[in-house]
Regions:
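Carbohydrate-binding surface patches
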Residues: 87, 634-676, 684, 725
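Acidic, Ser/Thr/Pro-rich beta/coil linker or hinge segments at domain junctions
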Residues: 674-719
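Extracellular glycan-recognition regions
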Residues: 478-633
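Aromatic- and acidic-residue-enriched carbohydrate-binding clefts of CAZyme catalytic domains
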Residues: 9-24, 182-220, 247-264, 271, ...
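Extended acidic/polar, glycine-enriched regions
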Residues: 35-37, 44-168
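Catalytic-core region of carbohydrate-active enzymes that cleave or remodel glycosidic bonds
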Residues: 226, 321-324, 328-331, 349-354, ...
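Extra-cytoplasmic beta-strand recognition segments
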Residues: 1, 25-27, 39-71, 96-103, ...
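An acidic-aromatic substrate-binding cleft motif
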Residues: 122-217, 224-233
Length: 730
């Protein structure tokens, strides 16, 4: 605002554009001397503007007096200098939508400037959108929008580079809108699909359980359009009539009297996707949004990681029965809780068997060590029961070793394709600086997308899909045994508040160390400075719990290194192994839905033996949980897949060890009758790096897959250290 100009600003709710989102801005411009006054927005972490790009601007506005109000809309660069502007005139006392186009010129004229918005040069990374008023008057403003007009395959409202990164994975399906945001933080926060379609102004904003704001500019209609654009079958997930249990209020069910209306909403989604607009009101809404053709919905998820209790079972059964009766052609995907074991898992599978649910959604976030130890997890699945959809999985980091672990387990899932019918990595996208969960498959900032090692592994499978697969028994040095450190330290982390007193560490040689009390207030790692060496030891302490639902974690062993141990106190007791910087549960009790009472006291003893391979926990002198780590991890795997239609055989080789290894594939090639000519012309796509711990959250993977000739006349293939290889023969 220049000297002599004067204006005021306030937020109002009276007479809004949309009652669903009533808050809007009122700007009272008293006087303008020199430069105009107005509103500006720097976006999320600044706005990136690109040379040669055009931006679609829109806003709703009204002149309170009814007199015409001249408005200048401008894009400004990092220094506040204008890049593009346009003039509008707001006239009339009623709300109206005003639109214009803002075009950022190229610095110099050229005939060969790029036309792909992803390739255009960035001229501003901390840009600003300005709505400027040039005369005195009073104006109301709402729903201001500014989007680049470049679209990937014509898909509006999505960043082209992000959609491209997703499309290049060649996904067969996409699950949305996510996990815990589906059932929400209480009933008012439960994701209601029908509130995310239609005019965007009438989609009520909300928050989600991860703390993000949801404007629903991307709603269910846009998700279906995204799936259509990338040729992925949609898999929408709706709440099972119960909110998320991982909150202070626990799971809250939809009231019994409201369930018929909710079931109608679930069936309405199927109609919105598939019904005829001429005969169905929901389908007419789809047509009104510009898509009279059906979306061809085949799958519908009901529930996400829910607490499987009698209330959940009642709500789920009612939804399931109603959908099956109304739309038997829809394949319903059920849920069996957040982990691949435990009470919810067992109860979820019981319900699946009783109802004969076609597919159940399992979730599993585990360390690379856990995955390598459990490559046979699906070998023993019931072939006569529900099919398995591994709907959320990952290995808790973006390093190469994590990608290799995921490649190994994906090979085994592929070999168990008769029962593991679907799988999807999660989470998918994360904006740098705004992460509530790591790792993610694709990170991005305002300028570009970053593909992780996990991404490249997914892509190597997605571009070599097959219809038949077999595991291969591998002889020789496939086992990895970890050398655990003798270091004994102690630190505390967690999200709760607790006092830890009377802390005594006693080693197997009789050395005894008393540590100062710790008043922990959820304030990040608190270290004690303990530095001993021992193979076995005990830790005694008195834990007084004050508040917090996520517990307090006591780390022991080499707490500053990648391999140590954790004992967790809270709504459950849990022992964890941290290996290569990633943790997984060794043993634990069921998580209680009740909060820990403030002032609860536990007299705890943690037993650690064999340098952390063996753990046990006592509370008040009673054994609670215990477990022992299996020493050997299968770190070298081979699997075979066949694309019958394409006539191509894929040999997948994982070598997650520090030395290259020669793999004799001759028996496999002979068994598949691969001709000599095909063996001579094979190609290998190899993902590898010297450092297994290369790869950082939020950054591009340091290396990416490389394709090269692979002559297999002898049947021998040398797999590089720390590598995943897909050999194509055909």
């Amino acid at each position: 605002m220049s000297s002599g100009s004067f204006a005021t600003f306030c937020v109002r709710t009276a007479n809004p554009v949309a009652e669903e989102n009533p808050h809007h801005a009122r700007v009272e411009v008293r006087s303008v001397a020199g430069d105009p006054v107005g509103l500006e927005n720097t976006g999320f972490d600044g706005m990136v503007f690109r040379a040669g790009e055009s931006y679609r601007f829109s806003m709703w506005a009204r002149s309170v007096s009814g007199d015409a109000m001249p408005v200048r809309v401008a894009l400004a660069d990092d220094d506040g200098e204008p890049l593009a502007d346009a003039e509008l005139s707001v006239a009339g006392e009623s709300w109206a939508k005003y639109e214009t186009t803002l075009s950022v010129p190229f610095p110099t004229a050229a005939d060969d400037e790029p036309t792909d918005g992803e390739a255009r040069g960035i001229v501003s990374t901390q840009g600003t959108l300005r709505v400027l008023f040039r005369e005195a008057g009073v104006v109301d403003v709402d729903f201001v929008s500014c989007e680049p007009m470049t679209a990937y395959k014509g898909l509006e409202h999505f960043r082209p580079d992000l959609v491209r990164a997703l499309d290049e994975l060649h996904p067969r399906f996409m699950r949305f809108p996510g996990g815990c945001i589906t059932h929400g933080l209480g009933l008012d926060n439960m994701y209601r699909w029908e509130r995310t379609i239609g005019p965007v102004e009438h989609r009520p904003h909300n928050f989600n359980v991860w703390g993000y704001h949801q404007s629903f500019r991307i709603g269910f209609y846009e998700y279906f359009r995204l799936c259509e654009t990338i040729s992925a079958k949609p898999l929408p997930v709706l709440p099972a009539g119960v909110s998320c249990q991982n909150t202070s209020q626990g799971p809250v069910p939809i009231a019994d009297e409201d369930m018929p209306g909710y079931i109608d909403s679930v069936i309405g989604l199927i109609d919105f996707c598939n019904a005829d607009p001429e005969t169905n009101a929901w389908a007419a809404k789809r047509a009104a949004m510009g898509h009279p053709e059906p979306f061809g919905l085949e799958y519908l998820g009901i529930g996400n990681e829910d607490r499987i209790d009698p209330v959940f079972e009642d709500r789920f059964r009612r939804i399931y029965d109603a959908v099956r009766a109304a739309h038997p052609e829809i394949t319903i995907v059920g849920t069996v809780g957040p982990d691949p074991s435990g009470r919810d898992y067992d109860e979820g599978w019981r319900i699946a068997r009783e109802l004969r649910i076609p597919i159940v959604d399992e979730h599993s976030y585990r360390s690379p060590s856990w995955w390598f130890h459990h490559l046979d997890h699906y070998d023993h699945a019931d072939r006569n029961g529900s099919r398995i959809y591994l709907g959320e999985y990952g290995s808790r980091d973006t390093r190469l070793v994590n990608g290799l672990a995921e490649a190994a387990v994906m090979g085994r899932m592929e070999a168990n394709g008769d029962v593991v019918t679907m799988a999807s990595y999660a989470p998918l996208f994360c904006k740098n600086g705004h992460n509530s969960w790591d790792p993610d498959l694709i990170y991005f900032d305002n300028e570009r997308a970053y593909r992780t090692y996990n991404y490249w592994v997914q892509r190597m499978f997605a571009t070599t899909t097959a219809d038949t697969a077999w595991p291969v028994a591998v002889d020789g040095g496939i086992l990895f045994r970890r050398e655990l450190p003798r270091t004994v330290g102690l630190s505390v982390t967690g999200g709760a508040s607790a006092d830890l007193a009377d802390i005594v560490v006693t080693t197997d040689t009789g050395e005894r160390v008393e540590l100062p009390d710790i008043a922990y207030r959820g304030n990040g790692p608190v270290t004690t400075g303990l530095a001993l060496e021992a193979d076995s030891y005990t830790v005694d302490m008195t834990v007084t719990y004050h508040e917090g639902m996520w517990g307090v974690q006591v780390h022991t062993g080499d707490v500053n290194g990648p391999d140590h141990n954790v004992a967790s106190f809270g709504r459950s007791f849990e022992l964890q192994l941290v290996r290569e910087g990633c943790g997984s549960t060794l043993a634990g009790t069921e998580v209680s839905m009740d909060m820990v009472r403030p002032g609860t006291v536990w007299h705890a003893r943690i037993h650690v033996a064999d340098r952390g391979a063996d753990m046990a926990l006592e509370i008040d002198g009673q054994p609670i949980v215990a477990g022992r780590e299996v020493a050997d991890e299968p770190r070298r795997t081979v699997s075979v897949a066949r694309d019958s239609a394409g006539g191509v055989t894929y040999l997948r080789v994982v070598n997650a060890m520090a030395d290259p290894v020669s793999v004799d594939l001759s028996q496999v090639l002979d068994a598949l009758d691969v001709p000599v000519s095909s063996r001579a012309a094979a190609t290998a796509t190899v993902l590898t790096a010297d450092d297994p711990y290369a790869g950082v959250h939020g950054e591009e993977a340091p290396t990416r897959p490389v394709e090269r000739p692979c002559e297999l006349m002898s049947g021998m293939y040398e797999a590089p250290a720390w590598s995943f290889t897909v050999i194509a023969v055909g």
